[in-house]
From Swiss-Prot:
Gene: rpo5
Keyword Transferase: yes
Catalytically driven reaction(s): RNA(n) + a ribonucleoside 5'-triphosphate = RNA(n+1) + diphosphate
Identification of the protein by name: DNA-directed RNA polymerase subunit Rpo5
One example GO MF annotation: DNA binding
GO cellular component, one term: cytoplasm
Amino acid sequence: MRSSSKKIDPSVHVLVPKHEVLSVEEAFKVLKELGIGPEQLPWMRASDPMARTINAKPGDIVKITRKSPIVGELVVYRYVVSG
């Protein structure tokens, strides 16, 4: 069995929410609003398929925007760690 060299882009799947790496300024603003340090956010490994797709590096903060029929739009944040 041969492994395929094709890369699959998980961001095009209908069930995968929008992911984006925040700039340093945006990350600082979010952390200040939440009153927490980056390590207190839920973690996302740098090896996560979406982290690799958006080129997130350890130390980055990723903004994830989910669409929900109940709340409309839900924004969550993840702190990227190595692994």
